[in-house]
């Protein structure tokens, strides 16, 4: 039995740099001297030696070459041989060597396996094939990824091909093209419908559509005429990817997206090639929009949004609702649809500004939001007004060059902070339809009713503003502290930054940028200085509470201020 050590002995014990073989196997505490104490106690001191550690590959100099060589040196599993395989010609040996990697990689199984079968059937040196050679052919016949009806038929007598290393290793360009998704969606599909369409010249010579049909067979990489992938899952994935390429129109403030994605609307969906047998190619001299509409109607269409040019006008199409995308030119809505009764009432989609003094008097209860007219809030105009205000605050003609430079540096800091989170806001809201914007505004007004009731029960002065800084509510005591009238602050577009000094504005944007995206912190404590109407400064300690919308984007900021006397 192992002797129990005292606490002092345990403290004095130090682990050995390297254990001996015996201590390593028995998981004992070895000592640094040789022979060690454990081996001396057991009378095996003559065999006490350091354990040989296994060195890692990067220390021994072994790299990728060593790994490859070890894999290549591994003996392959031998197939069940036959008398034919024992007396194999040099060409046959090359064929068997090349068949195994093709079988494992499964890149071009259809073409190569067909070529191998033809070679087996037409090899003059091969005599009658025994019956036990059939398992070899069964192993070599891998189920193809595509239908191989377009390949060489090995059953036709007299068919003979020359089996060389070049035509075995070099794949068919069209087969490789159909097996590459990126090439298919960018190269092959764009040949059928683009601005410099090749068919226009073909149709001018021959209008019967035969050249077009032949080019469609070639360009589609043997996927036309009803031939599809063998996997239903892969077919559905190709359908959805093709619909996204054809119909999705990206709306982004970056110029790179607007120059390429929005203008390239004439790309044909790859999913339509499996259904081209339903389309009359003789009518391809009609406009492109009608052709694309036929491609859509040939199967149940999966869409994430239509472009304005190719939006269908058939009310029976299940994607027609998404044709009316959100644009900057928002039009009025007069007809009530069969959709959500909460949203579909007499509502106007407008970019006109409605001051908070009107909305606060209009929506005094929750039922008013559903019974009275509601207008959406257009945030881009609010951000433009904010930018103009910041330029006025941090500008000035009667300042020294040093003061101008200091104010300019602060303005640049603020604009960089706004640019850090505003693209995320745009990305979250760019695909929203007009009813979604109304729903967000209704959520804001409904939350505002609750917060205004809470502010009446709270003794601290309170101001509420949108994420742009636009004031939407202020208590009377806070307005009196700042020597303002609450009606004057709410009758027009006013920002909370008009009531702060320069340093407080910079501090606020630093805090807001940290919690605007990613960080879901909802409470911020800080100290700021507010300006009165007579340009006096009052120092406040304040708490900012952030209310977020369904996209976790700040919707309302509730600021509670306590003056420091």
From Swiss-Prot:
One BP term from GO: cellular response to starvation
Where is this protein primarily located?
A: nucleus
Q: Name one GO molecular function term.
A: RNA polymerase II transcription regulatory region sequence-specific DNA binding
Instruction: Point to the regions of Low complexity compositional bias.
Output: 252-269
Pfam families for this protein: PAS_13, Zn_clus
The record's subcellular locations are: Nucleus
Any Gene Ontology CC annotation: nucleus
- Locate the region Disordered: 63-106, 250-269
Give start-end positions of Polar residues composition bias. Answer: 82-93
- Cysteines engaged in disulfide bonds, as pairs: none
Keywords, A to Z, come to:
DNA-binding, Metal-binding, Nucleus, Transcription, Transcription regulation, Zinc
Q: Which InterPro entries match?
A: ERT1_acuK_gluconeogen_tf (IPR050335), PAS_13 (IPR056751), Zn2-C6_fun-type_DNA-bd_sf (IPR036864), Zn2Cys6_DnaBD (IPR001138)
DNA-binding region ranges: 20-48
Q: Has UniProt tagged this entry with the keyword Transcription? A: yes
Looking at the keywords, is Zinc present?
yes
**Record function comment:** Transcription factor which regulates nonfermentable carbon utilization.
Give the family from UniProt: Belongs to the ERT1/acuK family.
Protein name from the UniProt record = Glucose starvation modulator protein 1
Species for this entry: Candida dubliniensis (strain CD36 / ATCC MYA-646 / CBS 7987 / NCPF 3949 / NRRL Y-17841) (Yeast)
Q: What is the lineage of its organism?
A: Eukaryota, Fungi, Dikarya, Ascomycota, Saccharomycotina
